[in-house]
Amino acid sequence: MSASFAGKKLLVVGGTSGMGFETARLVLKNGGSVVLVGNRRDKAEQARQALAADSQISIIVADLMKEEGMKHVVDTINAEHKDISLLVNAAGVFFPKPFTEHDTSDYDMYMSINRATFFITRDVVRNMVDAGIKGSIVNIGSMWAQQAIGATPSSAYSMAKAGLHALTKNLAIELGGKGIRVNAISPAVVHTPIYESFIPKDDVEDVMNSFGSFHPIGRVGTPVDIAETVAFLLSDKTDWVTGAIWDIDGGVMAGRNA
C-alpha cells in the first residue's frame, strides 16, 4: 500500500461493479476516498461492504437513464462533494443488435448515459475550476468506437462511445491550462457483468473463453487489467498525459493473428 492518492477524492460513475469498482478499490488502497454512483441501492451497498472502508466511501444511487437521476447526482455532488479531484466515467450499457432492428428506445438508452456523463462531468469540472483543484478525468471508452466487429453488431453503442472519445479530446484541450487532465481508455472484450444483460449468466464464462483468440495476447481482459491502467492515468505519474485514448485491448487494435 502507498499513499499516492492521499487527500484525493474520486468519483466513479458506474462504480458498483466491473472496471469502475476495481478502480475504486485501487484508489482506496492507495490512500484516497471514493464516491460511487450506481443505479441499485442493494448493489451499491454490497460494493461498499466489499471495499471494507466505509469511512472513505460514499454512495449515490441514481438511474442515469432518467433526467431526474442525473440531476440527483449533480445536486449531491454540489452539496456534499465539491472537493472531488478525480473522476472516472465508467457507466455504460451494451446490447448488441443489428442496425435495422434498433428502435428509438435503444438509441435513447445509449444517449441518456452520454447525457448524464456530460453534465455530471461538467459540474465536477466547474467545482474543480472554481476551487483551483488540479486533477484527472478518465473516460471508459471502447474498442467498438474504433472498429466494427461482425459478431457483435453495435452501431448505437459504438456511436455513443465514439462521442465519449471525442469529448475526451475536447476537454483535454479546454482544461489543460487549468491543470485538469482528461484521458480515455479503449478496452476490447473484458469479462464484466455487462455481458449478463444479453447472455445467460451460466453461459458467460464459455462465451468469454470463445473470445480469447480474438485478442493477440490470447485471453479476454479482466476488470483489474483495466483498473490498473485507469489508476495509472489518475495518478501523478502521468502528469504529462492528456487527450490520450489508450488501447487496453490485448493487442486487438495492433492487427490480427490471421
Across the structure, where does each feature detected by a protein language model lie?
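Conserved glycine-rich cofactor-binding loop
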Residues: 16-18
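Conserved NAD(P)H cofactor-binding loop of Rossmann-fold oxidoreductase domains
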Residues: 90-96, 251
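Substrate-binding pocket helix/loop in short-chain dehydrogenase/reductase
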Residues: 98-99, 105-109, 207, 211
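Active-site helix of classical SDR
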Residues: 113, 121, 160, 168
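Alpha-helical segment proximal to the catalytic Tyr-Lys
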Residues: 126, 173-177, 239
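Residue(s) in the substrate-gating loop at a strand-loop-helix junction
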Residues: 142
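Short, flexible catalytic-loop segment of classical short-chain dehydrogenase/reductase
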Residues: 187-197, 254
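Short C-terminal tail/terminal secondary-structure segment
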Residues: 231, 242-258
